[in-house]
Design a protein with these regions (language model features):
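Amphipathic alpha-helical interface segments used for dimerization/assembly
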Residues: 23, 27, 41, 66-70
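Short, charged recognition helix plus adjacent turn
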Residues: 6, 12, 74-83
Length: 83
């Protein structure tokens, strides 16, 4: 019997890149900075800089708060598509 589930390894590099790419797109579209986003999302102007720097660590709960903040902000700026 073969194992039907395949696990894709998600690395630290992957999660760093995913957030930074998303943050860059948001910052450009909304003419804002990583510092301003960090303050608004998690009360830390340096958070995204730490995520961006592979030599520095970050808290996964803070990472999740940042993702949730981006989710909420993106919903606010999306054009009305629901009908």
């Amino acid at each position: 019997m073969s194992d039907m589930t395949q696990h894709t390894e998600i690395t630290e590099t992957d999660i760093r890149a995913a957030l930074i790419t998303r943050a860059e797109v948001f910052a450009k579209a909304n003419k804002t900075s990583f510092s301003a986003m960090g303050i608004s999302a998690v009360g830390d102007s340096k958070f995204l800089s730490r995520v961006q720097n592979p030599s520095l660590g970050f808290n996964i709960k803070t990472y999740q708060k940042m993702v949730e903040w981006l989710d909420a902000q993106e919903r606010l700026v999306q054009p009305e598509n629901a009908a």
